[in-house]
Amino acid sequence: MATPDQKSPNVLLQNLCCRILGRSEADVAQQFQFAVRVIGSNFAPTVERDEFLVAEKIKKELIRQRREADAALFSELHRKLHSQGVLKNKWSILYLLLNLSEDPRKQASKVTSYASLFAQALPRDAHSTPYYYARPQTLPLNYQDRSTQAQSSGSLGSSGISSIGMCGLSGPTPVQPFLPGQSHQAPGVGDGLRQQLGPRLAWTLTGNQPSSQTPTSKGFPNALSRNLTRSRREGDPGGTLEVTEAALVRDILYVFQGIDGKNIKMSSTENCYKVEAKANLNKSLRDTAVRLAELGWLHNKIRKYADQRSLDRSFGLVGQSFCAALHQELKEYYRLLSVLHSQLQLEDDQGVNLGLESSLTLRRLLVWTYDPKIRLKTLAALVDHCQGRKGGELASAVHAYTKTGDPYMKSLVQHILSLVSHPVLSFLYRWIYDGELEDTYHEFFVASDPTVKTDRLWHDKYTLRKSMIPSFITMDQSRKVLLIGKSINFLHQVCHDQTPTTKMIAVTKSAESPRDAADLFTDLENAFQGKIDAAYFETSKYLLDVLNKKYSLLEHMQAMRRYLLLGQGDFIRHLMDLLKPELVRPATTLYQHNLTGILETAVRATNAQFDSPEILKRLDVRLLEVSPGDTGWDVFSLDYHVDGPIATVFTRECMSHYLRVFNFLWRAKRMEYILTDIRKGHMCNAKLLRNMPEFSGVLHQCHILASEMVHFIHQMQYYITFEVLECSWDELWNRVQQAQDLDHIIAAHEAFLNTITSRCLLDSNSRVLLNQLRAVFDQIIELQNAQDVMYRAALEELQRRLQFEEKKKQREIEGQWGVTAAEEEEENKRIREFQDSIPKMCSQLRILTHFYQGVVQQFLVLLTTSSDESLQFLSFRLDFNEHYKAREPRLRVSLGSRGRRSSHT
């Protein structure tokens, strides 16, 4: 018998079978026959013959192993290889290299597991249709260690083949040399044989070694048992259905997408996914499936919100950006699911065992979906937190989730925030650089009221929606943003300044994409703040320059001080002198054009004539509403017309304050004017009335009372002029000079008016004080009237006495009797009547003095109890010598206690 060639394929294959199984040639005859049949079959990988696809897999594998440099080197070498064209089968070489490189660490374990090769392959491959097996590149191939079965009763392979011989063949199957190139068995015979072998081998494999998986699987079910084991309890009376892990995996992948599986369905009552009660599962698999199904619930929650809000047009651009961000995250999630689905489909299509490390199990899904679950939980929390929000409020809700210590979660939310905030920043840059507000759905924190007219543009047309201010924008920044756009619109619409914005502001690059927005968020305190500050300062400076140079805002403010606050002393005094004959008349007899003529005369006769014509033409006379008994002094007022841009600072409310302050100052000035006339009367009539010694007591009382009134009015005028007007004006002027925007000027001006209004006793808290002060003013007018009557009576009496003496001297010169008895009696009677009227005059003066002092004392008591320190100090000045303190116990207690508190402090 010829010795077979030791290098022939038959001998090598037989030696390989002996080496793997560790048996003699006689014992491996049946396995050798099967091996020959397998080699002669049509097994081929089903991977697509794509050279570049394999190259990409190699690069990904290198990157996964953190060998980026090797991946780059491989890419360069592959490029050179492709360009040279020396090799013809590049795909085959790359595919070989890829398979050779896979999992070299598992080689040691494979040596001991070769014995199970045929035990695994026989039941699957002994049928008519050959399987095309291509192992996934991401999952390593592994065989179970079945070394323990060699110590059991016979080998699995021999028992399987003997059963085949007994059940399927009439005799032993001869070993045929199935070498490449030789003819195969007849198709009919081979097909029929394999159709009988398949189920018998499967049953033999599963029935003979039920415990062989236990030590090697370590809790992971074998892929063969998952795919081929069928429930034997389907006909049980309990109706329970044994579910394999493979079926659970398939259901879970559907649940991940929100689709009910065969065994896992959504419970509408409990709002969660639950495993069917009839499914026969151990507690571990059931709990794992429920944990995995949570991803489906999270997916449904996010998908439902995104789909519903995407169709809501009123949700606005910010909301649509949020929905787009959610869809983008779901897209990444779907990409993972597609990979898992392809892996599962590959296992089903191949029909071969991929090994424990290659198959999809619930525990592997639990590990692989750990990070996606965190992302979905974060997105679901965002969805809950953003319910009912839109615009800047929605951006604030997203921004709140960036304040976390988890870098993974923080990066996710920051990415979403960059998308969500992009419309807000687009609104913002359009507003600060163009002054345009295109906020159809009211998402921006700047609101516009189209019904407001131009004259109220600055005050009422543009406001802040505080609820829409994103939390990453401070209130100071939002106020500046409002002022920038408002300044641009004010210049265009009110000042009629059509200067392009680019000449006012150095326009920088805005947030043109979410990437720009993301970059901007990384430096909110510097880059973003710098843009806002630059636009704010440049726009505000340009606006103030226009108001000061073109519209003379500061000159108009000084004109208010000179004319309405009586700062132009010579003009006011001369105007009073000219108006006195007119204003003493009843108010109903006055005509405005007459008073306007007098005003123009006073302007031409004083330094007011040197003011700008623009200012003088705005100065006018105004008559207040007339009440019964009013004189011209009660209804006369100066007015200053404002319009255009300056009306934004000098609003109607401000002009109303000016009018009230002017009336108060005008009345106080009139009191000073009256007391001056009283003092003139004293000085002029003192010499004339020396010949009437009986009238000296009246003159003395008038002089004392007038002196008290002069002291009071002088102190009040000093307080009003210096402590109120001058100090407040100096503070206003300093603030106006330092103002950075128009709002600062308006605020300073309003604060100035509020200060002088309250300190001039014109606010609601000082009505009692003002009434007392008006009562003092009324007593001054009463003194003037009483003194005029007394002087008139005294001068008439003096005139009659002089006439009597003159007549007497004239008669004596003519040689007649100077006076007859009847004439002398009549003269004496008239003198007695005059002398009898003097006590009445003195009594009237005493009553007037008493009433005046009582009013002043009450006024001082009110001053000491005022919360304004300047008014408290005014009480010291008015009663510096404690004249009224000695007369009024309440004043004495109040002043004493206040003095003790001051000294103690």
Swiss-Prot record:
Transmembrane segments: none annotated. The modification N-acetylalanine is found at residue 2. One of its GO terms (biological process) is microtubule nucleation. Its main location: cytoplasm. Residues 206-228 have a biased composition (Polar residues). One of its GO terms (cellular component) is polar microtubule. The keyword RNA-binding does not apply. Keywords: Acetylation, Cytoplasm, Cytoskeleton, Microtubule, Phosphoprotein. It is found in: Cytoplasm, Cytoskeleton, Microtubule organizing center, Centrosome. Residues 174-193, 206-239 are annotated as: Disordered. The keyword S-adenosyl-L-methionine does not apply. The modification Phosphoserine is found at residue 113. One of its GO terms (molecular function) is gamma-tubulin binding. Component of the gamma-tubulin ring complex (gTuRC) consisting of TUBGCP2, TUBGCP3, TUBGCP4, TUBGCP5 and TUBGCP6 and gamma-tubulin TUBG1 or TUBG2. TUBGCP2, TUBGCP3, TUBGCP4, TUBGCP5 and TUBGCP6 assemble in a 5:5:2:1:1 stoichiometry; each is associated with a gamma-tubulin, thereby arranging 14 gamma-tubulins in a helical manner. Gamma-tubulin at the first position is blocked by TUBGCP3 at the last position, allowing 13 protafilaments to grow into a microtubule. Component of the gamma-tubulin ring complex (gTuRC) which mediates microtubule nucleation. The gTuRC regulates the minus-end nucleation of alpha-beta tubulin heterodimers that grow into microtubule protafilaments, a critical step in centrosome duplication and spindle formation. Belongs to the TUBGCP family. This is Gamma-tubulin complex component 3. It comes from Mus musculus (Mouse). The lineage of its organism: Eukaryota, Metazoa, Chordata, Craniata, Vertebrata. The gene is Tubgcp3.
